[in-house]
Design a protein with these regions (language model features):
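Non-catalytic alpha/beta scaffold blocks inside enzyme catalytic domains
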Residues: 1-255, 308-312
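Long, low-complexity segments enriched in small/aliphatic residues
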Residues: 237-312
Length: 312
């Protein structure tokens, strides 16, 4: 019945999802509200403001609807007060129709292909551990294994082992490069932004000495005298599904617990006044594969030229 978008530009961050939103909007009787940077999303929306203050005001003044979809972007979460904004978004969902009997419309829009699956595996800093930004600072660590993380700058000092498929930023910082396979060169399990487990199959073999990531890590573990308990992709998948059964339920969504949203909404939320901006600044160069493409570079240059002309 209604969609609340917070700190996201679905047209750039998730074009397929944006097309679904537009399709639903064209069918009528859908109210869309945007909090963040204004943009052409290909459908009409009510603009409620740029920051957390606007979100708090919206929570106080808006009326509940039948089924509300709350879409929280990484632009809202990748800030020092991201936790507070997430709590406010949960409060909006709880109060305005985002959570109810048979309906959970509280959603986070991710901008990295592997992030949802990583969260399912618990890839988050434990108590007292370092997050990625802290790891990258000078003097934090002696050795860093970089598994294709090209959007973070690692300060001088640490010895960096890079495992990836393209000669992007992470490879340029590396002391040792172990060439990995691109997603088209290996079979894998992916989890999309809605939490649906999906499988992909290898199209071609990786070139040269490149290997699939799991094989590289398995070989390293053996060389270090601590061999991992698998010798094939099928054995690795068996271990994965034993530890995390929902990875075996392909094309199914693991439902979220509404109680967790209630607990999140109850947290204190002291958010800043800064505008909530989208994380995507150049649609055509958002990942290492796109940045290695001459066609994408040309598209980016043409798009930037149009923006410059519009500004003039």
């Amino acid at each position: 019945d209604a969609i609340l978008i917070i700190g996201a530009n679905p047209r750039k961050e998730a074009p397929v999802l944006n097309a679904r939103i537009r399709k639903r909007w064209l069918s009528g009787e859908l109210t869309i509200t945007l909090i963040g940077a204004q943009a052409d999303l290909t459908y009409d929306y009510d603009y409620a403001g740029a920051g957390a203050e606007s979100l708090m005001q919206f929570i106080e003044t808006a009326q509940p609807v039948g089924k509300l979809l709350v879409l929280v972007g990484q632009g809202a979460l990748s800030r020092s007060d991201g936790g507070a904004i997430l709590a406010l978004a949960a409060k909006a969902a709880q109060k305005l129709g985002g959570v109810g009997e048979g309906w959970n419309g509280f959603s986070v829009l991710h901008t990295a292909a592997a992030r949802v699956g990583a969260l399912d595996l618990g890839f988050t800093p434990g108590a007292g551990a370092l997050d990625a930004q802290a790891m990258a600072k000078a003097g934090a660590l002696d050795v860093i294994f970089n598994l294709g993380a090209d959007e973070i700058a690692i300060d001088p000092g640490a010895f960096v082992v890079y495992i990836g498929s393209h000669g992007d930023r992470g490879a340029h910082r590396a002391d040792v490069i172990l060439p990995g396979a691109a997603y088209t060169e290996k079979s894998g399990i992916f989890v999309n932004t809605e939490g649906r487990v999906q499988m992909s199959s290898r199209v071609v073999f990786p070139p040269g000495d490149a290997r699939e990531d799991w094989a590289i890590l398995r070989a390293l573990s053996g060389a270090l005298g601590q061999p991992l308990p698998f010798d094939s992709l099928s054995a690795l998948r068996k271990k994965l599904i034993e530890a995390y059964p929902h990875f075996g339920r392909v094309d199914q969504i693991a439902p979220g617990a509404a109680t967790q949203i209630s607990a999140l909404a109850a947290q204190p939320a002291q958010a800043g006044r800064e505008p909530v901006l989208s994380m995507i600044h150049d649609f055509y160069l958002t990942n290492p594969i796109a940045r290695a493409s001459a066609v994408m570079a040309e598209c980016s240059a043409l798009a930037q030229g149009r923006l410059t002309q519009a500004a003039e």
